[in-house]
From Swiss-Prot:
Cytoplasmic side, ranges: 1-31, 85-86, 136-147, 205-208, 290-302, 337-340, 387-391, 428-455
GO MF terms, alphabetically ordered: guanine transmembrane transporter activity
Periplasmic side: 56-65, 104-115, 169-186, 229-260, 319-320, 356-366
Membrane disposition: Multi-pass membrane protein
Domain of life: Bacteria
Claim: Cell membrane is one of the keywords in the record: yes
Segments traversing the membrane: 32-55, 66-84, 87-103, 116-135, 148-168, 187-204, 209-228, 261-289, 303-318, 321-336, 341-355, 367-386
Phylogenetic classification of the source organism: Bacteria, Pseudomonadati, Pseudomonadota, Gammaproteobacteria, Enterobacterales
Primary localisation category: membrane
Membrane-embedded but not crossing: residue ranges: 392-427
Gene label: ghxQ
UniProt name for this protein: Guanine/hypoxanthine permease GhxQ
InterPro entries xref list: Azg-like, NCS2
Family: Belongs to the nucleobase:cation symporter-2 (NCS2) (TC 2.A.40) family. Azg-like subfamily.
Pfam families according to UniProt: Xan_ur_permease (PF00860)
C-alpha cells in the first residue's frame, strides 16, 4: 500500500510535536478539527457498547464482562490505527460478526463460549497472516475501480437503511408484499432524526465547525428532557471483568476446541467475510476522506489492514466479538478528520467510558441517526466517480452498490459486482481488460458462496 504523503518545500511547517507526528497541517487539518472528528465518530459508534453485550448476552456471555471487553477492543484497535497507521478510522467489535458469533456459532451450532472465542482468535491470526503477507493488499490492488466506487455507494445506502430502521422510520412490512414499509412517521425518534438531518444540512452548508457533533449533543439533551426512555443512570461505575458467576472472559478461549473439524468451516467463514467486508469499508472511508494517493491506493493502507486484523486477535483474548473498522468512521471524516489523531481520540474515549458506562445510555439512537444518514448521503456522491465510458465497469459497480443494501451484506454485493464484471467483460469481448487477480478473486468469492460458507 502507499506510504504517507510527503512534505514538499512549499508545504506548511508542522506546528509542534503533535502536528509533526500526525502530519495534521500537512493533511490540511487542525488539532481542533481532529478532536471534533474523533468525538463525532465516538458518538456515532458508542451504541456498540450496548448492542454487542446485548447480542452476546443472549448466547450466554456475561453482558457486564462483554461491555468491558468491547470497550477494550475499541480502545486498543482505534489507538493502534491512530498511533501506528495514522488514519482517521476507528475500530470496534463488528456488529455483523458479533451476530454470527452469537447466533450461528454459539446458539446455532451449540459451541461453547470458550470455543467460540478460540474461533475468533484463530480468525484474527489467519486474518493477520493474510494482511502481513500482502494477500489483502493484493486484493485491494485488484479491486476494479467501478466496484471500489460501488462499494462506497452501497455502504452509503446501507448506512441510510441502518439509521432509518434504527429509529423506526423504515420497518419490516407487517403484511405480505414488499419487504419494508414506512414506520411511525410522527413518532418522536423519527421526527428528531429528520429534524437533526435537516439541521446538519444547514450547518454544513454554512461550514459551522463541529456541526454534526453539535446536532448529536443537542438531540441527546432534548431526549433527556422529553423522552422517558432516556434516563440519567449516574456518572461513574467501576468496570467489571467477571460475570455473575465470578468467571472472567479474559484468556478463557479454547483454541484446540476451535480447531475441531466441525468448527473450522465457521472460522474460514469469519475470515472470508472479514477480509472483504473490512477491506471494502477501509477503502470507502479512505476515499471519502481523500486519503488516496495518485494511484488510488490508501495512504498507509498496509498498516491500516494489519491494525484491523490484529484487533481481532485481541478480541479473542479479552472475550469479545471479532473487530473491524467501523463504517461510522465516515461520520468523523465528514466532520473533517484526516489523521490518526481522530482515531486516537476515539480510542481514548472508549477507554474512558469503561468508568463512565452510565453516560452511554444518554445518547439515544435518534441522536446519532442524523449523522449516519448524512454520511450515507455524502457517500452516494461516488456515483459521479463511475466511468460510464467503461460501461461494464460502471454497471458492475452499480450492481455491487444496489445488492449491498438489498441483501444487507457488503460481501454479497462485492461478490455479485465481481461476477457481473467478469461475465460482462467476456460477453462484451473485453476479456483483455481482465487481469488474473480479478478472475481469481471472483472464483474465490463464488466458491465461498457456492460452498454455503457465507455469513
Amino acid at each position: 500500500m502507499s506510504g504517507d504523503i510527503l512534505q514538499t518545500p512549499d508545504a506548511p511547517k508542522p506546528q509542534g510535536a503533535l502536528d509533526n507526528y500526525f502530519k495534521i497541517t500537512a493533511r490540511g487539518s487542525t488539532v481542533r478539527q481532529e478532536v471534533l472528528a474523533g468525538l463525532t465518530t465516538f458518538l456515532a459508534m458508542v451504541y456498540s457498547v450496548i448492542v454487542v453485550p446485548g447480542m452476546l448476552g443472549k448466547a450466554g456471555f456475561p453482558p457486564a464482562a462483554v461491555f468491558v471487553a468491547t470497550c477494550l477492543v475499541a480502545g486498543f484497535g482505534s489507538l493502534l490505527m491512530g498511533l501506528w497507521a495514522n488514519l482517521p478510522m476507528a475500530i470496534g467489535c463488528a456488529i455483523s460478526l458479533t451476530a454470527f458469533t452469537a447466533f450461528s456459532l454459539v446458539l446455532g451450532q451449540q459451541i461453547s463460549v470458550p470455543v467460540a472465542l478460540g474461533a475468533v482468535f484463530l480468525m484474527g491470526v489467519i486474518f493477520t497472516a493474510i494482511s502481513v503477507t500482502g494477500v489483502r493488499t493484493w486484493i485491494l490492488r485488484n479491486l476494479p475501480m467501478g466496484i471500489a466506487h460501488g462499494t462506497g455507494i452501497g455502504i452509503g445506502l446501507f448506512l441510510l437503511l441502518i439509521a432509518a430502521n434504527g429509529v423506526g422510520m423504515v420497518i419490516k412490512n407487517p403484511i405480505e408484499g414488499l419487504p419494508v414499509a414506512l414506520g411511525a412517521f410522527t413518532s418522536f425518534p423519527v421526527m428528531m432524526s429528520l429534524l437533526g438531518l435537516a439541521v446538519i444540512f444547514g450547518l454544513e452548508k454554512c461550514r459551522v465547525p463541529g456541526g454534526i457533533l453539535l446536532v448529536i449533543i443537542a438531540i441527546s439533551i432534548i431526549g433527556l428532557i422529553f423522552d422517558p426512555a432516556v434516563k440519567y443512570h449516574g456518572l461513574v461505575a467501576m468496570p467489571s471483568l467477571t460475570g455473575e458467576d465470578g468467571k472472567s472472559l479474559i484468556f478463557s478461549l479454547d483454541i484446540m476446541g476451535a480447531l475441531q473439524p466441525t468448527v473450522l468451516p465457521s472460522v474460514l467463514a469469519l475470515v472470508m467475510t472479514a477480509v472483504f467486508d473490512a477491506t471494502g469499508t477501509i477503502r470507502a472511508v479512505a476515499g471519502q476522506a481523500n486519503l488516496l494517493d495518485k494511484d488510488n491506493q490508501i495512504i498507509n493502507g498496509g498498516k491500516a489492514l494489519t491494525s484491523d486484523s490484529v484487533s481481532s486477535i485481541f478480541s479473542g483474548l479479552v472475550g469479545a466479538a471479532p473487530a473491524a473498522v467501523y463504517i461510522e468512521s465516515a461520520a468523523g471524516t465528514a466532520a473533517g478528520g484526516k489523521t490518526g489523531l481522530t482515531a486516537t481520540v476515539v480510542g481514548a474515549l472508549f477507554l474512558l467510558i469503561l468508568f463512565l458506562s452510565p453516560l452511554s445510555f444518554l445518547i439515544p439512537g435518534y441522536a446519532t441517526a442524523p449523522a449516519l444518514m448524512y454520511v450515507g448521503l455524502l457517500m452516494l456522491s461516488n456515483v459521479s466517480k463511475l466511468d460510464f465510458n467503461d460501461f461494464i465497469d460502471a454497471m458492475a459497480g452499480l450492481v455491487c452498490a444496489v445488492f449491498i443494501v438489498l441483501t444487507c451484506n457488503i460481501v454479497t454485493g462485492i461478490m455479485l459486482g465481481f461476477v457481473t464484471l467478469v461475465v460482462g467483460r467476456v460477453f462484451a469481448r473485453e476479456w483483455q481488460k481482465l487481469n488474473i487477480g480479478t478472475v481469481i478473486i471472483t472464483a474465490a468469492l463464488v466458491a465461498f458462496y457456492a460452498g454455503g460458507w457465507a455469513i
